[in-house]
Amino acid sequence: FLSEPGNAYKQCHKKGGHCFPKEKICIPPSSDFGKMDCRWRWKCCKKRSGK
């Protein structure tokens, strides 16, 4: 199964997040979703929205 370019991390993106290196701290009020479907030693962080 090959995903389309840019859609490699569907689970993370569905939650509105992006993959970051594991060392990055997700600063509140961002959410840290953990690894999700990001690559090894990365994690999914959702940056706070402007709403």
Swiss-Prot record:
User: Which UniProt key words apply to this protein?
Assistant: Antimicrobial, Disulfide bond, Ion channel impairing toxin, Myotoxin, Neurotoxin, Potassium channel impairing toxin, Secreted, Signal, Toxin, Voltage-gated potassium channel impairing toxin
Q: Does the keyword Disulfide bond apply?
A: yes
Recorded GO cellular component terms are:
extracellular region
Q: Does the keyword Signal apply?
A: yes
Which tissues express it? Expressed by the venom gland.
- Which GO biological process categories is it annotated with? envenomation resulting in occlusion of the pore of voltage-gated potassium channel in another organism
Task: Check the record and name the InterPro entries matching this protein.
Answer: Myo_ane_neurotoxin_sf (IPR023355), Myotoxin (IPR000881)
Q: Which residues form the signal peptide?
A: 1-8
| Chief localisation class | secreted
Short name of one Pfam family: Myotoxins
Spell out the molecular function terms from Gene Ontology: potassium channel regulator activity; toxin activity
Q: Which domain of life is it from?
A: Eukaryota
Disulfide bonding pattern of the chain: 12-44, 19-38, 26-45
Compartments it resides in? Secreted
SUBUNIT field: Monomer.
Its function, per the record, reads: Cationic peptide that possesses multiple functions. It acts as a cell-penetrating peptide (CPP), and as a potent voltage-gated potassium channel (Kv) inhibitor. It exhibits antimicrobial activities, hind limb paralysis, and severe muscle necrosis by a non-enzymatic mechanism.
Family, as annotated: Belongs to the crotamine-myotoxin family.
Query: What is the name of this protein?
Result: Myotoxin-4
